[in-house]
């Protein structure tokens, strides 16, 4: 009996996602298994709920590690131990079965090889959910579990037909996979959403600044808008001229900071002299509609700056009021 389906089982408490409160939440696992030869292999996994990592499982550890205080969700210790034991059995069996498949397919396929798996469930409003499991071989998406069976994607190589036939013949494992994806995963995620609500709903305001990048060509400038420290992950950043979006804006990948906030930069290449009047605009849920606008050349308007100015003005007013009251008291004492 092949245990590749268990890979999916493992993957259920793991799934990517992006989420906002009262919107869709994605829970997913990414497993990476590398096989240098028949005697050396390793498997590592990470689990995400929305933008937050909730679990990790190193090849060097027998147990799944929690990365959040609420990573067990609402599961009891007994429930969690049962799941963990199943995943331990799965990982051992998966490694063995992949080696058997490679042996069976030789010389068409041989070491080194890499297998990646992603699995989990996406939660929708009203307790609706949708599960998934995808398998990649040597970086190419080749197999999925859909409905009640394993399926080869159209572009997958023909040698996968036999392993998939064997997997689908194992009715007990297929039923277990369905239960884990369609029942256990949504149940576990609901508990995580409740237990991790403060972290999931956290709003961190972005900080933005401008800089000049390396000149892309003679007579041209590269303008760079940096945005950092924001959470949740979704953000909109664009170079503008007045109300006109600049189509040449290039946004890089959104990258994680060490404190679980995010960083993004947006660049714009312009001819020297055409940079006047350009501004970088940042929209984020934490700003509550008060966009950050940074003007190239020094003029800046942002909520943070406004709050600082207001704070300074309040301190000045308080100091003046204190001075006036104190002066009046002294005058009154002199009269007495």
Curated annotation (Swiss-Prot):
GO molecular function, one term: lipid antigen binding
InterPro entries: Ig-like_dom, Ig-like_dom_sf, Ig-like_fold, Ig_C1-set, MHC_class-I_related, MHC_I-like_Ag-recog, MHC_I-like_Ag-recog_sf, MHC_I/II-like_Ag-recog
Keywords from the named record: Cell membrane, Disulfide bond, Endoplasmic reticulum, Endosome, Glycoprotein, Immunity, Immunoglobulin domain, Innate immunity, Lysosome, Membrane, Signal, Transmembrane, Transmembrane helix
Organism: Rattus norvegicus (Rat)
Ig-like domain ranges (all copies): 198-296
GO cellular component terms, A-Z: basolateral plasma membrane; cell surface; cytoplasm; early endosome; endoplasmic reticulum membrane; endosome membrane; external side of plasma membrane; extracellular space
SS bond list: 121-185, 225-280
Entries under Pfam families matching the protein: C1-set (PF07654), MHC_I_3 (PF16497)
Residues modified by glycosylation: 24, 37, 59, 127, 182
Topology with respect to the bilayer: Single-pass type I membrane protein
Quaternary structure (record): Heterodimer with B2M (beta-2-microglobulin). Interacts with MHC II and CD74.
SUPFAM superfamilies assigned: Immunoglobulin, MHC antigen-recognition domain
Highest taxon listed in the record's lineage: Eukaryota
Amino-acid positions noted as binding a D-galactosylceramide in the UniProt annotation, renumbered to this chain: 97, 170-173
GO process terms (BP): antigen processing and presentation; antigen processing and presentation, endogenous lipid antigen via MHC class Ib; antigen processing and presentation, exogenous lipid antigen via MHC class Ib; immune response; innate immune response; NK T cell differentiation; positive regulation of interleukin-2 production; positive regulation of interleukin-4 production
Ranges that cross the membrane: 305-325
Signal peptide, first to last residue: 1-17
Residue ranges annotated as motif Internalization signal: 332-335
Protein name (database record): Antigen-presenting glycoprotein CD1d
Spans within the Extracellular topological domain: 18-304
Function comment: Antigen-presenting protein that binds self and non-self glycolipids and presents them to T-cell receptors on natural killer T-cells.
Broad class of the protein's primary localization: membrane
Taxonomy of the source species: Eukaryota, Metazoa, Chordata, Craniata, Vertebrata
Additional remarks: During protein synthesis and maturation, CD1 family members bind endogenous lipids that are replaced by lipid or glycolipid antigens when the proteins are internalized and pass through endosomes, before trafficking back to the cell surface.
Compartment list: Cell membrane; Basolateral cell membrane; Endosome membrane; Lysosome membrane
Cytoplasmic side: 326-336
């Amino acid at each position: 009996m092949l245990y590749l389906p268990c890979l999916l089982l493992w993957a259920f408490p793991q799934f990517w996602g992006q989420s906002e409160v009262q919107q869709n939440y994605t829970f997913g696992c990414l497993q990476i298994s590398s096989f240098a030869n028949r005697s050396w292999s390793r498997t590592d996994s990470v689990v995400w709920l929305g933008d937050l990592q909730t679990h990790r499982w190193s090849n060097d550890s027998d147990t799944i590690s929690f990365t959040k205080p609420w990573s067990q969700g609402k599961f009891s210790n007994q429930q969690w131990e049962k799941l963990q034991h199943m995943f331990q059995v799965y990982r051992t069996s998966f490694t063995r079965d992949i080696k058997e498949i490679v042996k069976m397919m030789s010389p068409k396929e041989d070491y080194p090889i890499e297998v990646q798996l992603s699995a989990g469930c996406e939660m929708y409003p009203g307790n609706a959910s949708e599960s998934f499991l995808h398998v990649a071989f040597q970086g190419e998406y080749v197999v999925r579990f859909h409905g009640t069976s394993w399926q080869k994607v159209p572009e997958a190589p023909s040698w996968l037909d036999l392993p998939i036939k064997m997997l689908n013949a194992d009715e007990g494992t297929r039923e277990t996979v369905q239960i884990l994806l369609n029942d256990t995963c949504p149940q576990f995620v609901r508990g995580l959403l409740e237990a991790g609500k403060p972290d999931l709903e956290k709003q961190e305001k972005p900080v933005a600044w401008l800089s000049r990048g390396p000149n892309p060509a003679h007579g041209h400038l590269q303008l760079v808008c940096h945005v950092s420290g924001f959470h949740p992950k979704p953000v909109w950043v664009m170079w503008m001229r007045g109300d006109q979006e600049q189509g040449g804006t290039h946004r890089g990948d959104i990258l994680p900071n060490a404190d679980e906030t995010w960083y993004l930069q947006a660049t714009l290449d312009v001819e020297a002299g055409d940079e006047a009047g350009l501004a970088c605009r940042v929209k984020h849920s934490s700003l509550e509609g008060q966009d950050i606008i940074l003007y190239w050349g020094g003029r800046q308007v942002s909520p943070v700056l406004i709050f600082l100015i207001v704070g300074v003005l309040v301190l000045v007013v308080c100091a003046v009021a204190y001075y006036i009251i104190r002066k009046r008291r002294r005058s009154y004492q002199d009269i007495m």
